[in-house]
Amino acid sequence: MGEKPTIAISHLGCEKNRIDTEHMLGLLVKAGYGVDTNEELADYVIVNTCSFIESAREESVKTLVELAEANKKIVITGCMAQHFQTQLLEELPEAVAVVGTGDYHKIVNVIERAEQGERVTLVSAKPTYIADETTPRYRTTTEGVAYLRVAEGCDYRCAFCIIPHLRGNQRSRTIESIVAEAEQLVAQGVQEIILISQITTNYGLDIYGKPKLAELLRALGKINVPWIRMHYAYPTGLTPDVIAAIQETPNVLPYLDLPLQHSHSEVLRSMNRPWQGRVNDEIIERLKIAIPGAVLRTTFIVGFPGETEAQFEHLLQFVQRHEFDHVGVFTFSAEEGTPAYKLSNQLPQEVMDERRDRLMALQQPISWRKNQQEVGKTVEVLIEQENPESGKLIGRSGRFSPEVDGQVYVDGEAKLGTIIPVKIHSADEYDLFGQVVSHN
């Protein structure tokens, strides 16, 4: 048999998609395929697509079209493949395969079949697969950080969200499986493990009959990794037991990523959020009291169908009052196949854009003040890269999660992938600036 083809992967979308990408790379490398970062040199390009909102789809389509124009053999994977497999095959003759979110672990078989001239469609209608610690994985993050998926899929049916259709219902891994993978990551030198799923606070509900996040955090606390960070914690799932586990487990960062989406009870009911109108001041204040120094990140959707000016003002006041450390704002995106798509009272895009801009303008001085509070402190920073032009090191303190939050720009010398003390001397609304604290 001749030499195996080389394969490049173009990764788009969220960190859940990134883990899928890393498993595909691991499986291909184990099977003896050459993996190249240069798409021009590769025989096949796997495009791991995102289909969460319209702008993500546009980026995916743009990438696919560019590769098609370069006459590449394209394997389309990820959420867009799950969502639009028929249209993609019809419109892109260069696509040799379409692989769904529950089928990426069969990527080696897909390439083998494509090599035989078959046009492969492998899309499970209801994804049920979840990789575990035995699935090969080739990490694409910086050496000090790794994402760790604790569960896949979602049992909630929020009116705006297509994720359950794209990723299936929730399926959790066992605590033992997650701990085993965490130990593998630590052996690779990982300093920060970021726990992800669709709803991390619901972890374990499907396999244990009740959420087991507190038990998971305590188990991971016994592992020799400096930082454990959680993403996607629903406020109603932050029970006294979970809060106690965060407090009692030294390597769990007091960083809470709360996808609140809105503050007004009527909008939350329209969104079919699981807590309906229970996102209120009491929940946020309880968290701040229970975990002093907690860093709170959240995301909001503005312009949900029927959102009135008064309801938007309620959101503005909520954000002003609680002074979150980090806020992401999305304008509502009408997704075909979701209940919100059919709602008659859709808002014009210009109204949504204006509301997004107003909310971001309100948050900016809050973020600036929060960062100014770090000036003068010596903080632990995970060094991730070096700017070759300026010589400055770039990293993150525990306040910042990768890609969504700010960074710390550092003068001095340090090894990439290590956590070092840095004295912060200045800050803007996004980033911190500091100097390595020498050990002499």
UniProtKB/Swiss-Prot annotation:
Top-level enzyme category: transferase
Cofactor binding mode and count: Binds 2 [4Fe-4S] clusters. One cluster is coordinated with 3 cysteines and an exchangeable S-adenosyl-L-methionine.
Residue ranges of every copy of the MTTase N-terminal domain listed in the record: 5-116
Compartments it resides in: Cytoplasm
Catalysed reaction equations from the record: L-aspartate(89)-[ribosomal protein uS12]-hydrogen + (sulfur carrier)-SH + AH2 + 2 S-adenosyl-L-methionine = 3-methylsulfanyl-L-aspartate(89)-[ribosomal protein uS12]-hydrogen + (sulfur carrier)-H + 5'-deoxyadenosine + L-methionine + A + S-adenosyl-L-homocysteine + 2 H(+)
Domain Radical SAM core, first and last residues per copy: 140-370
Cofactor: [4Fe-4S] cluster
Start and end residues of each TRAM domain: 372-438
Identification of the protein by name: Ribosomal protein uS12 methylthiotransferase RimO
Family: Belongs to the methylthiotransferase family. RimO subfamily.
Entry binding sites for [4Fe-4S] cluster 2: C154, C158, C161
Function: Catalyzes the methylthiolation of an aspartic acid residue of ribosomal protein uS12.
EC numbers for this chain: 2.8.4.4
PROSITE patterns with a match to the protein in the record: MTTASE_N, MTTASE_RADICAL, RADICAL_SAM, TRAM
Binding locations of [4Fe-4S] cluster 1: C14, C50, C79
GO biological process: tRNA modification
NCBIfam families noted in UniProt: 30S ribosomal protein S12 methylthiotransferase RimO (TIGR01125), MiaB/RimO family radical SAM methylthiotransferase (TIGR00089)
Any GO MF annotation of the entry: protein methylthiotransferase activity
SMART domains recorded: Elp3
Keyword set, alphabetical order: 4Fe-4S, Cytoplasm, Iron, Iron-sulfur, Metal-binding, S-adenosyl-L-methionine, Transferase
SUPFAM superfamilies: Radical SAM enzymes
GO cellular component labels: cytosol
